[in-house]
Amino acid sequence: MNHCLLAISAVYFKAKWLTPFEKEFTSDYPFYVSPTEMVDVSMMSMYGELFNHASVKESFGNFSIIELPYVGDTSMMVILPDKIDGLESIEQNLTDTNFKKWCNSLDAMFIDVHIPKFKVTGSYNLVDTLVKSGLTEVFGSTGDYSNMCNLDVSVDAMIHKTYIDVNEEYTEAAAATCALVSDCASTITNEFCVDHPFIYVIRHVDGKILFVGRYCSPTTNC
């Protein structure tokens, strides 16, 4: 008799923004899922805050990147293509080397930020992906698990489940943040409006990538 060994990996991330979004500034806003189609999303907004930002020009496309820090040692990097349908070419070139280069180009500036509230859940079988990457000896009848147990077992599925919830998560410290905005009212600000598909990368301060995903529409995880 063959006994099936099911390997399960789960990722959960939730953290408070270092500079929280005020719920009173959240409102419905058009989000372009394609150049010809848009839907309304709950768009979070903050004004005149200081964030690391860069406008990047590459042969495969131009985009903007911003770092939104969390309390603690993590931050979310948002990569927004200049073109509404420019996400795929950036994804294809999202290598470790390129990502580090883009992060090194960041400069602090005052920015008005608009980004959707979103929840992303997913469940994926990683077997095909891992086999394509060369990890073939652990799956099916070729796997040798004699050091783990005396049964005839095989790994037939590797399920990866994800969940991320991005919302305002503001605290009492938000009042002090508002004071900073008024102090800097005369400062020239830029705008980072996430109104079409984007990539988000959650990373640790030491550079380790904790989570990578994309948001294409409020109705699908794409």
Swiss-Prot record:
PROSITE patterns: SERPIN
Signal sequence bounds: none
Protein origin, superkingdom: Viruses
SMART domains in the cross-refs: SERPIN
Record-linked InterPro entries: Serpin_CS (IPR023795), Serpin_dom (IPR023796), Serpin_fam (IPR000215), Serpin_sf (IPR036186), Serpin_sf_1 (IPR042178), Serpin_sf_2 (IPR042185)
Example of a GO cellular component annotation carried by this entry: extracellular space
Molecular function GO terms recorded: serine-type endopeptidase inhibitor activity
PANTHER family: GH10112P-RELATED, SERINE PROTEASE INHIBITOR, SERPIN
Family the entry assigns: Belongs to the serpin family. Poxviruses subfamily.
Protein name as catalogued: Putative serine proteinase inhibitor 2 homolog second part
Lineage: Viruses, Varidnaviria, Bamfordvirae, Nucleocytoviricota, Pokkesviricetes
